[in-house]
């Protein structure tokens, strides 16, 4: 018997909060209200579909022909506006309305009839054949149901609604049998621990920062990984990669297999680690990264960061970028930095428009070998890798893990994104005002 397809409607928390507030403001008493999300369909896997909103609309009171506690009707001009501006560009529609009362609401007979006709209408009236997802909430927006109609409007499937950064399944057995390994993390809540245990993380770059990061996040409870890195272990890596040995170097271990070894030392069973010993450019890497709940890039080049950011933007996945830098001042004293950046998922700024990635350097790094030699000879890029030390990488990696823990637990607000820079020997954390990272004309995120 085939497993059923899992369909989820995923809304970033900032977008959901704004939508919910706008819905509540659009009624005077306890009238029903309606709002719309226009979504991109993302086929995560053969049996998993995710709907990601690109924009939302809540009609103002003058957009209703009729509005009461028992029903509502939109004006024809407003409805035509929605069709022309959103459905014709190939987006699917999620329409959400409220019912009076508190507790789990049910779809009414009128809902069934209207939605069945509407699902058939939009799929036959537009070349892209958009799908209709409908949701009903109680008047306080505390309880809800969602469903997706087929294109003929004859039957529907259940849709999971998720209004957090992360979307994971709930395993009833895990709820009843908490893992003693994490007993001293109970202060953060059992639901938070289950979320960490189910979280699927893509790690791009399994070197000095990435390996420490994987060890730390793994011990926090993350068991599901996709590891991407084309490189093999070398002797010069041994000073900053925990548990790496000369024997691994001599056996020419790929870094992804070394990091998998670190995770499997923590979890002899119950973990799932996919290793992809290629660059992020490969189609296999891209497909696997797109299935993850969170993308972390810990590489030492701009091109891979650019690719990771583009994937995160396309599939609306949270992205965490980790990096360090060391240079020497004229008096031969070192300046050391680490940087942790999390662009906002709902848009506003990305690593490119925030100048966290140099597109010029990314272009050089993706160029053929002969171009590298040419630009190197005229001083555009250096031929020696940046210096690195274990303890600075550890500060960066552990801060990144702390940020993710805060994102999962809800005690760190990243709606506007964060960009933190640590400087040593001053031992200062500088927190960028992300308003200055915003760009209205960024080609990538606007």
How does the language model describe each region?
Residues 189-232:
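Glycine-rich adenosine-cofactor-binding loop
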Residues 256-294, 299-305:
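A structured beta-alpha segment of the ubiquitous adenosine-cofactor-binding alpha/beta core
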Residues 171-201:
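A short, basic/flexible loop-to-alpha-helix module at the beginning of a structural domain
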Residues 209-214, 235, 302-307:
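Short glycine/serine/threonine-rich phosphate/pyrophosphate-binding segments
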Residues 1-94, 100-169:
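Conserved beta-strand-loop surface patch within small alpha/beta domains used
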Residues 224-268:
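Glycine-rich phosphate-binding loop and adjoining beta1-alpha1-beta2 segment
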Residues 129-131, 269-270, 315-317:
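A short helix->loop->beta-strand "cap" motif at the edges of active sites that frequently abuts
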Residues 124-125, 138-151, 167-172, 195, ...:
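Glycine-rich phosphate/adenylate-binding loop
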């Amino acid at each position: 018997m085939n497993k059923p397809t899992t369909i989820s409607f995923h809304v970033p928390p900032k977008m959901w909060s704004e939508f919910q507030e706008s819905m509540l403001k659009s009624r005077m008493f306890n009238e029903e209200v309606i709002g719309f999300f226009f979504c991109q369909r993302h086929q995560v896997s053969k049996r998993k579909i995710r709907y990601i909103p690109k924009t939302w609309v809540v009609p103002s009171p003058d957009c209703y022909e009729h509005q009461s506690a028992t029903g509502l009707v939109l004006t024809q001009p407003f409805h035509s506006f929605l069709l022309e501006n959103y459905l014709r560009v190939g987006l699917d529609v999620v329409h959400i309305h409220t019912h009076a009362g508190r507790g789990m609401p049910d779809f009414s007979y009128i809902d069934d009839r209207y939605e069945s006709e509407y699902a058939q209408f939009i799929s036959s009236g537009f070349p892209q054949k958009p799908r209709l997802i409908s949701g009903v909430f109680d008047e306080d927006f505390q309880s809800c149901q969602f469903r997706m109609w087929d294109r003929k409007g004859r039957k529907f499937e259940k849709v999971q609604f998720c209004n957090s950064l992360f979307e994971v399944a709930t395993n009833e057995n895990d709820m009843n049998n908490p893992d003693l390994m994490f007993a001293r993390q109970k202060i953060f809540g059992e639901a938070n621990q289950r979320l960490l245990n189910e979280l699927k993380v893509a790690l791009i770059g399994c070197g000095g920062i990435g390996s420490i990061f994987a060890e730390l996040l793994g011990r926090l409870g993350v068991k599901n990984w996709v590891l991407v890195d084309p490189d093999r272990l070398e002797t010069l890596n041994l000073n900053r990669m925990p548990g790496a040995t000369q024997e691994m170097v001599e056996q020419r271990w790929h870094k992804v297999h070394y990091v998998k070894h670190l995770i499997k030392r923590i979890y002899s069973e119950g973990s799932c680690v996919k290793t992809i010993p290629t660059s992020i450019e490969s189609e296999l890497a891209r497909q696997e990264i797109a299935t993850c709940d969170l993308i972390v890039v810990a590489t030492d080049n701009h091109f891979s960061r650019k690719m990771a950011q583009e994937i995160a933007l396309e599939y609306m996945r949270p992205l965490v970028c980790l990096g360090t830098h060391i240079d020497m001042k004229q008096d031969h004293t070192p300046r050391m930095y680490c940087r942790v950046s999390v662009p906002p998922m709902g848009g506003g700024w990305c690593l490119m428009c925030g100048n966290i990635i140099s597109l010029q350097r990314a272009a050089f790094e993706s160029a053929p070998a002969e171009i590298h030699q040419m630009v190197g000879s005229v001083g555009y890029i250096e031929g020696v890798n940046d210096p690195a030390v274990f303890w600075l990488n550890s500060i960066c990696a552990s801060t990144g893990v702390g940020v993710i823990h805060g994102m999962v637990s809800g005690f760190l607000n990243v709606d506007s994104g964060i960009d933190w820079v640590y400087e040593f020997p001053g031992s200062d954390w500088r927190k960028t005002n992300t308003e200055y990272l915003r760009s209205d004309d960024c080609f990538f995120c606007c």
